[in-house]
A protein has these predicted regions:
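Short, surface-exposed ligand- or partner-binding patches at beta-edge/loop junctions that are enriched
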Residues: 60-61
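Rhodanese-like catalytic fold shared by cysteine-dependent sulfurtransferases
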Residues: 1-17, 21-56, 65-104
């Protein structure tokens, strides 16, 4: 199941699995605190299986175009999971003053 949530109004659960699907250089320039780099082209069943099946996966990108595509790709691998697309991406998070981190 894919659902959408505005990143600016979203409250991250304490142990959230947050995947930033931009390329690694864009991720290193700045990403939402707690997000891990999972470039869209690298998403596969092996990576997906590293996350507990009942754990929602929160997906974001730079501005909101790659994350929905990544969610569709993941849903194609396992439709029983919950995928949450964080709309607006890193750009909206930065503009809203949410904490960002730099580096890999």
């Amino acid at each position: 199941m894919i659902r959408k949530q505005e990143i600016t109004t979203f409250e991250f659960p304490e142990k959230a699995v947050i995947w930033d699907v931009r390329d690694s250089s864009a991720y290193a320039e700045g990403h939402v605190k707690g997000a891990v780099s999972r470039p869209i082209n690298d998403l596969n069943a092996d990576i997906l299986n590293q996350v507990a099946a009942d754990q929602p996966i929160y997906i974001l990108c730079g501005g909101g175009s790659k994350a929905p595509r990544a969610a569709e790709k993941l849903e194609g691998l396992d439709a029983s999971r919950e995928y949450v697309v964080l709309m607006g991406g890193t750009r909206a998070a930065r503009d809203a003053g949410l904490p960002l981190e730099q580096g890999a």
